[in-house]
From Swiss-Prot:
The gene is yhjJ. The lineage of its organism: Bacteria, Pseudomonadati, Pseudomonadota, Gammaproteobacteria, Enterobacterales. GO terms for biological process: proteolysis. It is found in: Periplasm. One of its GO terms (cellular component) is periplasmic space. This is Protein YhjJ. Has lost the active site residues. SUPFAM superfamilies: LuxS/MPP-like metallohydrolase (SSF63411). Belongs to the peptidase M16 family. It comes from the Bacteria.
Length: 495
């Protein structure tokens, strides 16, 4: 398999070189983002958005620790610490702290004040614009959370007797599909929603806090209509006094490759059967232009595929079928799914409809007309790039930045994006797109059926037989497909 991978990579580079856009140039970070690292290791990133004067000021503090750093005896510590933080005034007087949290909440886009996951803890504040006093208080509060919490039996008991405002990612860590996806991963034994073991030892929570809440493992992000230089100075003054340094690296969360199985999972997450045709591959960080162009090509191929299937279903007047497409990065595994919403008794028929279209695209590709329409649409979107950017509010900009950091993607300036994207669209051909589609559709795929609780379990063997009859290639085609197995870059989305 190593040889296959190497052959493929060489083939991909030759294909891109023939289009004239392989470059090893490092992507240049968007200079609109001011960023730095304090002497104690804390990283900060600030974006001033004068084009959005009425938007709220978004503040995020990410601590690179979560439930994966807990031992069995420490279960629940990573969830308990922010609970304790939310019941303390954080260096402010009690009235100031109350006011900060009342105003630091966007009623239009409510977000939990803290989200704990396997590898991170995220503190969220959304402040009214033109309130520099509140921003100063928010930074004071977060700096206090970062290294000055009071953890005693009394403060722990007070926190545990108060309402739990700390959310987890994912929101339901025990949901059936999620537990299935974690099989074979160390994450399965480190649930961020796990309660504290009794009796609670405050001294052990304090030791855990001091070990993992160190400034060199923190990133602070501020986005809004602010004076970036003034905010940077305030960050240095407020956070610069924090002490501590990581002596033990945090475990890196990993997922096992998605198994190409056909499974039915009962869950409360759906009200109607949802069948997902799913594949996953290693996510490749995007730090240089050639990687970005490879990602764009794979991404555009997937979008073209979705357009094609939707149009064919509409043309054939398909009933009782809903179609969705979803790509995301989960702990550096890129996962994509074609989701079919269907009544239980139409599942086999609807899978057959979609699989037939997938097989046609894999074997014959998209038509020149479809390709031309897609590129025209993308060129139109590119012409509106700056208008779109100006309409993007601070909440969205902050979320995009968080995802880029998480997925190791360099954010580039709109001007650089426009230039690279235009060159990419001008160089793209229908043959290149069809080759990429062939590669993606020749991978082994899983059939994951989510069923509402209480529904009779569907016969997955029947679905698998339908799929195999249409999609499993002949022996000769299978060999060709294996040699074309893609180096994959998948669509980033919110964890």
């Amino acid at each position: 398999m190593q040889g296959t991978k190497i052959r493929l990579l060489a083939g991909s580079l030759l294909m891109l070189a023939s289009a004239g856009y392989v470059q090893a140039d490092a992507l240049q970070p968007d200079p609109a983002w001011q960023q730095g690292t304090l002497a104690n290791g804390l990283q900060w990133q600030v974006l001033a958005t004068p084009q959005r004067p009425s938007d709220r000021i978004e503040v995020r503090l990410q601590v690179n620790t979560g439930s994966l750093t807990e031992s069995t005896q420490q279960s629940g510590f990573s969830h308990a610490i922010p609970r304790i933080a939310l019941t303390q005034s954080g260096g402010l007087d009690a009235a100031q702290a109350r006011s900060l949290w009342q105003q630091g909440f966007d009623p239009k886009r409510p977000m939990p004040p803290v989200i704990v996951s396997y590898d991170s803890t995220l503190y969220n504040l959304s402040l009214p614009n033109n309130r520099n006093d509140l921003l100063k208080e928010a930074l004071t509060y977060l700096a206090n959370v970062s290294g000055k919490l009071t953890i005693t039996p009394e403060t722990v008991n007070h926190a545990l007797s108060s309402e739990d405002m700390v959310a987890t990612w994912p929101a339901d860590t025990k949901e059936g599909w999620w537990r299935y996806r974690l099989k074979g991963s160390a994450l399965l034994g480190h649930d961020p929603a796990e309660p504290l073991k009794q009796p609670v030892d405050a001294a052990k929570i304090q030791a855990f806090y001091e070990k993992w809440y160190t400034p060199d493992a923190m990133t602070l992000i501020v986005v809004g209509n602010i004076d970036a230089r003034s905010v940077a100075e305030q960050i240095n003054k407020t956070f610069g006094t924090l002490k501590g340094k990581r002596e033990t690296p945090a475990p890196v969360p990993t997922l096992s490759p998605l198994r190409a199985e056909s499974v039915s999972i009962m869950t409360d997450a759906v009200r109607q059967d949802r069948l997902s045709i799913m594949w996953d591959t290693p996510w490749q960080p995007i730090r240089e232009s050639a990687a970005l162009l490879r990602y764009w090509q794979a991404d555009l191929a997937r979008e073209a595929l979705f357009w094609h299937i939707q149009q064919e279903l509409t043309k054939n007047n398909a009933k009782d079928i809903g179609l969705g497409f979803d790509c995301r990065v989960l702990f550096l595994r890129a996962q994509c799914a074609i989701n079919i919403e269907s009544p239980n008794d139409k599942l086999n028929t609807n899978l057959s409809l979609v699989a037939n279209e997938l097989a046609k695209v894999r074997d014959k590709g998209l038509s020149e007309e479809e390709f031309t329409a897609l590129v025209a649409q993308k060129n139109l979107e590119l012409q509106k790039l700056f208008a779109t950017y100006a309409r993007t509010d601070t909440d969205i900009l902050t979320g995009q930045r968080m995802r880029s950091l998480q997925n190791q993607v360099v954010d580039i300036a709109p001007e650089q994006y426009q230039k690279l994207r235009q060159n990419f669209l001008n160089s793209l051909t229908v043959d290149m797109l069809n080759q990429n589609l062939r590669q993606q559709l020749s991978q082994e795929m899983a059939l994951i059926l989510l069923q509402p609780q209480g529904e009779p379990e569907f016969n997955m063997k029947a679905l698998k037989a339908t799929w195999d009859e249409i999609m499993v290639p002949t022996t000769a085609a299978a060999v060709e497909a294996d040699e074309a197995h893609p180096e994959v870059t998948e669509t980033p989305a919110a964890q």
